[in-house]
């Protein structure tokens, strides 16, 4: 119901949220009259009712670009604590705060596509959140959002410099820095990194040893049947445009036998990642629709999503 109400005024939307929330709260009150629960359990259930709706309110504010004066008391009105350690691992709570910091940042900086916006947001999170457990989660989310966006390495460098000055969380800093360094390594013009693959005979190979043709690398999993079929259909279309390229179909799973059973095309070079965790970090495989174009000398020419190429 609430998702269908995004065209309403903000005031009416809040009334609908309050109405739905009241129904849920009354049901919980009735439940408590019949079943005895601990104070902690009561708190967690109340928050489980509240925060999915708080996240929806923040989404409404974002999508409709609602003026600050209409929602600046929202924390007070709903008795929201941004530093409740009991909710550190409660996803709707963290999602709410993450959206809230976006909307707060947008009050001062309307240029949401600029790297300065994300740096401002980083500082706002640092100022608003005193709980290290919650802050570390939000810092990590923001850093990964920035690094995985299709922005320039120079812009990412500016953000990372600020991030590492502010963040005191060593494990997260190391993780973020590793991602950033790997991104620099796979920018167009650089050599394709060393990644080991297995062929259909089980032999281990390094595709960089093949220097006779340009290459297209794409990825799939036998656990995702719909994607498996869709990606190969798209690759079939792409091959007409890149007929002078050798196509490598890379399975990301561990089982050699299951992989062999699920191969659906012999019109490509079928290989499997030997260590997906290592490969995904080196190649930043955050999306199975990502494809790599390599030159004959195995330099990275382009990294893109296959849908961008099919549509264009």
Question: Where in the sequence are the language-model features?
Answer:
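Extended hydrophobic-aromatic, low-complexity segments
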Residues: 206-207, 218, 225-230, 257-260, ...
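Short acidic, S/G/P-rich loop/turn micro-motifs used as interaction or catalytic elements
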Residues: 148, 222-226, 254-256, 307
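Active/binding-pocket-proximal capping segment
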Residues: 222-223, 233-234, 241-244, 251-255, ...
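A short acidic, amphipathic alpha-helical/loop segment
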Residues: 158-162, 230-237, 261-262
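Oxidative protein folding and maturation machinery
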Residues: 1-202
